[in-house]
Amino acid sequence: MVLALQGGMAVGKTTAARYVAAHDPAVAVFFEDNSPALSNLQGRGLDKHRFADYCEIQRAFIQQEIDRYDRAAACPCALIDLGPQEIEFYTLFYPASIGKDWPVRQALAAELAALRRCRIDRTLFLQASVSVLQQRKEGDTTRDRGFFDHTVQHLLPAKERWFAAQSRVDFCQPTILRKPKLLPQC
């Protein structure tokens, strides 16, 4: 069984994943780690605002996510902080958020098809108001959230709608859950 945590930036996905990792050793937790894709792309001078470069960047992130999913799927019970659905959403919707009308679906059809074969059994989409997300962002100096404003303004509303249209997705407001209640309810 592969479960995924989703939601906006600073909503508490990693905090929830850390809690599960600390309290249930039967669940293998796979944290977000972009270093494989970033090291593959480093020094190549790619610009995500150019279509060909964007496609190359997304190929690296899609492959990274497929590899991570394969490791998670080999476990009896796994939890992924973000996951293949996140990469699919971002790949398809980021260009429009910066005013581009690129044929991403066509250019990355094979990669997106491979990504969609990464079957998540259930996704928990954590939701919080923009003001709560802003407070959490400001309270966490350990993470670079330079993309936060763009994400909240241009991607999060579309992301919530996109995930609501997917099967096997549950929505939850983590502000109403206390840590001891989180694991038994999920």
What function would you assign to each model-found segment?
Residues 13:
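Conserved lysine of the Walker
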